[in-house]
Amino acid sequence: MSQSYINVIGAGLAGSEAAYQIAKRGIPVKLYEMRGVKSTPQHKTADFAELVCSNSLRGDALTNAVGLLKEEMRRLDSVILKSAEATRVPAGGALAVDREGFSQMVTELVTNHPLIEVIREEITEIPNDDITVIATGPLTSDALAEKIHALNGGNGFYFYDAAAPIIDVNTIDMTKIYLKSRYDKGEAAYLNAPMTKQEFMDFHDALVNAEEAPLNSFEKEKYFEGCMPIEVMAKRGIKTMLYGPMKPVGLEYPDDYQGPRDGEYKTPYAVVQLRQDNAAGSLYNIVGFQTHLKWGEQKRVFQMIPGLENAEFVRYGVMHRNSYMDSPNLLEQTFRSKKQPNLFFAGQMTGVEGYVESAASGLVAGINAARLFKGEEALVFPETTAIGSLPHYVTHADSKHFQPMNVNFGIIKELDGPRIRDKKERYEKIAERALQDLAPYLDK
């Protein structure tokens, strides 16, 4: 092959992982990232793998599908997981990170690799012949997005994604807050703002009547269920939030709680949780409160939450449009393009949803781009693993109804034999089998 390097376009979670996986296999990489010369409305820095939504990489237990995926990625030497572990902050049973520290570490590990050349410029054309991984994310620049859209025959979809506000912890009234993780799982890592029934009803009424920021497009609003704006959720029904981000189950009042409550109930009617957002513990985000309300409305409504009456918002919630491909028709299970075989795609644009899933797609695409470069057979991870089931799902789903997908046990191949009724035991067996089946792939 005349090509002496592989291109990776985009240094987000997927692109950073892809570049790292290619370089560790001894192949030079040209990693293109436009931030630094051109930014996006949602990004705040030029660092790689910047987290623009939550700072949580979700559950860490093997009985959680994303926890299994993370363990598989650790064993495959993921630079994203390596950086996350080094910058983690307390979050109960979840893996949450110091947002800035995490991105800075990914940037350093990737930039300092001797085989990776970082080029800060916007790419507006798709390479015709060079092996290239395109991982420009849901915020792909307009010029390149048009080329990708044309390459794929105009087939593509979109949904709207949102981020939650971040608050200065020193402006929270801690007399109205208690520290606890749900069901006391892990360390007591969340600040909990309890509400009485009347407080919740007043909050719900203010939320559903608050003014939203206008969209920049006349297209129909479509949301990914896992990142739905809190005001959209509230409009679905008065109790919808009580089964979502304001669920009180497992968050009983502490014995010394002196605030208002409904009678002698040991559990609040509703709870708003806040999660540590940086290593210093000076910033907290409101868990599950992604929003597209106008900034003034966010301050007015969210300051109704007990303890947040005088809260200072260091970042208000924002919403952006995410585009993704018709992967079932356009991509092979290795994330290789069916239309232009020198191209691989990775990240949210492929229809995987979530930080960890995006990085996992970059890992798979990077490994297979390297194998194509070396003239080796493509590597398809087994469907009994999380990292094999996710690419299989997004490339084999029904194209007519295809929507972004988080990793979950429902897409991993079922166990042989009679179905185990106990969910925890069943998930443990699936995880055990997954790690066994992954073992032969670790040195490839």
From Swiss-Prot:
Q: Which cofactor does it need?
A: FAD
Positions with a binding annotation for FAD? G10, A11, G12, L13, A14, G15
Localization, per the record, is: Cytoplasm
Give the primary localization class.
cytoplasm
Pfam families according to UniProt? GIDA (PF01134)
Q: Which InterPro entries match?
A: FAD/NAD-bd_sf, MnmG-rel, MnmG-rel_CS, MnmG_N, TrmFO
Q: What class of enzyme is it?
A: transferase
Gene Ontology terms: cellular component: cytosol
Q: Which GO terms describe its biological process?
A: tRNA methylation; tRNA wobble uridine modification
Question: Per its record, what are the GO molecular function terms?
Answer: flavin adenine dinucleotide binding; tRNA (uracil(54)-C5)-methyltransferase activity, 5,10-methylenetetrahydrofolate-dependent
* Catalytic activities: uridine(54) in tRNA + (6R)-5,10-methylene-5,6,7,8-tetrahydrofolate + NADH + H(+) = 5-methyluridine(54) in tRNA + (6S)-5,6,7,8-tetrahydrofolate + NAD(+); uridine(54) in tRNA + (6R)-5,10-methylene-5,6,7,8-tetrahydrofolate + NADPH + H(+) = 5-methyluridine(54) in tRNA + (6S)-5,6,7,8-tetrahydrofolate + NADP(+)
Q: Which UniProt keyword terms apply here?
A: Cytoplasm, FAD, Flavoprotein, Methyltransferase, NAD, NADP, Transferase, tRNA processing
Q: What is its EC number?
A: 2.1.1.74
Q: Does the keyword Lyase apply?
A: no
- What's this chain's function? Catalyzes the folate-dependent formation of 5-methyl-uridine at position 54 (M-5-U54) in all tRNAs.
Q: Known HAMAP family for this protein?
A: TrmFO
Q: Family, per the entry?
A: Belongs to the MnmG family. TrmFO subfamily.
Q: What is this protein called?
A: Methylenetetrahydrofolate--tRNA-(uracil-5-)-methyltransferase TrmFO
Q: Which organism is it from?
A: Streptococcus gordonii (strain Challis / ATCC 35105 / BCRC 15272 / CH1 / DL1 / V288)
